Amino acid sequence: MTIQLINESSNTEKFQQICDKWRLVHDRSAILALVLTDERLELRKLDEPKLGAIAVNFVDGTMAHRRKFGGGRGEAVAKAVGIKGDYLPTIIDATAGLGRDAFVLASVGCKVLLVERNPIVAALLEDGLVRAYADPEIGAFMQERMILADVRNISLLDVAQQAADVVYLDPMYPHKQKSALVKKEMRVFQHLVGADLDSDNFFVPAKALARKRVVVKRPDYAPFLAEQKPDFSQTTKNHRFDVYLSHLKSA
């Protein structure tokens, strides 16, 4: 993985801490750049500046609008994880990405442990979480309900200590559409991490960690994860949520 590391902020020490923590190495020939400004950490595709920058922002913009005016418990992901009545499952989001589905779940009351294996994406996610924790409106519930795990892969979680009611998986899958039709964020992400070609390997550790169910979000044209037929699926316009029920008893 190659990336340029650019500091446009006045805080050189913070920039170096980010690079050291995530073990990032500057490559001046890379077309992707991780940039620290005085406001945020962001990802840019230098050969396509019109795409704009990608950053994690839970405080305002699209995510704030979704929290205030979205479907809440009625959102497809909330239904898929089994939210019903007073039941708010604990969740491991094993492919956290930019944390958007996790934020929906946290906004309705679920506690979510976020796992992200790509260090650049994890750095962006952590930056967004830190800013959200400091926000007077959402900071308190964010600190309680959205936590970034210390490990980068769910296979490293302790089944005895860190199992959850639900393990949620949304692995990257190749798009059918031509790249020009794919939204800017996905185009940059595809260049950064590509498809999760080894995503079948998530299934066994996910089942081990899930007390109630494993939920896998897939494009409607994608095969079942690890060729495992789900107990049932919930479909939306372009996606489906494959649900695998667990027989583990709660401790």
UniProtKB/Swiss-Prot annotation:
Its main location: cytoplasm. Specifically methylates the guanosine in position 1516 of 16S rRNA. InterPro entries: 16SrRNA_methylTrfase_J (IPR007536), SAM-dependent_MTases_sf (IPR029063). This is Ribosomal RNA small subunit methyltransferase J. S-adenosyl-L-methionine binds at residues 100-101, 116-117, 170. The gene is rsmJ. CDD domains: AdoMet_MTases (cd02440). GO terms for cellular component: cytoplasm. Belongs to the methyltransferase superfamily. RsmJ family. Keywords: Cytoplasm, Methyltransferase, rRNA processing, S-adenosyl-L-methionine, Transferase. Pfam families: SAM_MT. It catalyses: guanosine(1516) in 16S rRNA + S-adenosyl-L-methionine = N(2)-methylguanosine(1516) in 16S rRNA + S-adenosyl-L-homocysteine + H(+). It is found in: Cytoplasm. It comes from Actinobacillus pleuropneumoniae serotype 5b (strain L20). Its EC number is 2.1.1.242. GO terms for molecular function: rRNA (guanine-N2-)-methyltransferase activity.
